[in-house]
């Protein structure tokens, strides 16, 4: 009886503890591509999901319910079958649960318009972190490291540093790539700019924001709404504002406010003091005036 119980407990442990960090979904929209066998799109989707979800990206142990939910919505703009070249865009999103609630919050969202790679039907996807000579795998390794690092940052201050440095190293090693999106200073909003800015010393307040907003703010709201909102206000008016001022050329604060706008508006609409709402509004409007409709809701 004891032997049976021990075996069951051991099996339960291996079923619930996972080395893998991600629960990823891949969607491939190929409506703009005509005259191509749909089988290759379904094949690529399945291979990418298997790659993302089976790969062990770090040495950390994640419980099954701790795996990071993320999605990659790829739109194929052009597919050159003979050369195996895919010209795409990709909307990348990652979420995390909020403590003691059924609510999930977005921790990263980005539209990558330079999502170009090569892939031929039946091609094997063999990943080697030391030598990433496959553009398709480089793209998904980049976002996997970035998502895991950001997620860890939201649970402990600078907690994602190790894995984020791996993301930065991958990007630095891709500087000679013929594919777009990797080059330093080609764009303020490409893959290089995102990870380089995120890891720059002047942007430490932005990483502090990640911890204060999510862990000290949102996670606290289930226990004490007022205290949680106060922490969020401090994160925005101190951390986010300082990051924007110290590194005014970085697009990270704007990208962050683009995908947090609805959540932030709901946190303050009809709640909080007039002074608190005014201070938060001023910071957000100065960073991203294009989202003024959302910021106006804060003052209600």
Where are each of the predicted segments found?
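Start-of-domain marker
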Residues: 20-87, 98-100
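Sec-exported extracytoplasmic/periplasmic mature domains
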Residues: 49-57, 149-153, 265, 269
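Flexible, glycine-rich surface segments
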Residues: 159-249, 253
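Second-shell loop/turn segments in exported
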Residues: 31-38, 126-134, 246
